[in-house]
């Protein structure tokens, strides 16, 4: 029997209907995939933002934790010298070409920092002085630098001299106390502090201990080689004395 025209048309169209269904399904599936990719990308961006925020919170937490530890270390010193104002700061840069280990702190004139401010460690040992002050940062010349000068005294013998740096000892993290008498009574392990003479540095800032005594080249005086109480080469946090 000959099939009715409608049946023939239905049979002929069947492959095309199947193809259309496949294409339609493929497009729908592809659209779902693109939509899914967009959702995943949006979720990734959200996660990235959340991770960045968490990382910043951790950085802030670490900074506050470090500052709290530093202030605790300084409490006993600050209680003895309440007239001094200490500003917490972190080392944010070092010049690799500086043979005397100068560094940059993250505090500047906007925080009250000024050139010639003394810089001390968390334990109160003299590290150096501010030589350049920008609005949000400052550069520190360490006690290892030959251009650094602070009036110092051996606390036990009261022998006076000048605390300064030396190219001969800087690489070992040592500074010197010059102009001691040739027959000085100063000995190894004696403590050296500042005198306050000149008004740049407060009196009685800890510097370090005498490691050895060597005659000055002319033979007229003695140099005390000092091991600083805190090594300026590796310090990461410091206090700037903004007033005293």
Regions of interest found by a model, annotated:
Residues 1-28, 32, 39-42, 55, ...:
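A secondary-structure micro-motif
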Residues 43-53:
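N-terminal helix-turn-helix
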């Amino acid at each position: 029997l000959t099939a009715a025209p409608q049946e023939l048309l239905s049979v002929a169209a069947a492959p095309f209907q199947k193809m259309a269904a496949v294409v339609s399904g493929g497009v729908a599936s592809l659209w779902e995939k693109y939509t899914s990719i967009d959702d995943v990308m949006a979720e990734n961006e959200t996660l990235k933002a959340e991770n960045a925020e968490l990382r910043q919170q951790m950085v802030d937490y670490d900074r506050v934790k470090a500052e709290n530890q530093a202030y605790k270390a300084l409490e006993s010193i600050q209680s003895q010298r309440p007239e001094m104002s200490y500003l917490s700061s972190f080392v944010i840069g070092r010049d690799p070409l500086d043979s005397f280990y100068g560094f940059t702190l993250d505090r500047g004139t906007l925080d009250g920092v000024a050139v010639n401010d003394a810089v001390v460690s968390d334990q109160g040992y003299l590290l150096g002085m501010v030589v350049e002050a920008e609005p949000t940062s400052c550069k520190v010349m360490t006690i290892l630098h030959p251009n650094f000068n602070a009036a110092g005294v051996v606390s036990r013998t009261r022998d006076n001299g000048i605390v300064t740096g030396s190219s001969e000892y800087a690489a070992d993290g040592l500074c010197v106390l010059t102009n001691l008498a040739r027959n000085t009574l100063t000995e190894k392990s004696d403590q050296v502090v500042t005198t306050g003479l000149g008004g740049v540095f407060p009196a009685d800032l800890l510097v370090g201990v005498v490691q050895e005594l060597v005659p000055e080249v002319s033979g007229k005086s003695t140099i005390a080689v000092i091991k600083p109480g805190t090594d300026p080469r590796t310090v990461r946090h410091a206090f700037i004395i903004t007033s005293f």
